[in-house]
């Protein structure tokens, strides 16, 4: 599974303006809803609610400065994602107690459990690489961040 199949440079936010958990999720939901065209119009409020409800079950911050908020919403039509970066770090209730800097929002239609889980596993493996995380943090803009992702994808 290639990450570039469901995230493009237009779906990368290199400088999140939000400074707290729910605001980060809302900012990324807004960005995703504005840039993804599904079979139906993606309602940013509904998308944010789906992501926040999943977050209430357990934090999606996996440690090492990374969070993977995810959920299911039929309006997307297919697997979609949005990447965000918060250089200042955000308290995201991470397992390691450290601030979260990199966010990978993943949204899939309701009936796509297999694809959703494969994507989560692929993203988790990718973000376990400290060099990859460092390169994403040091990338200048959305295009540079996308290049880091696509270069890593080429190895897969």
Predicted regions and their residues:
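Cytosolic covalent-transfer regions centered on His/Cys nucleophiles
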Residues: 1-156
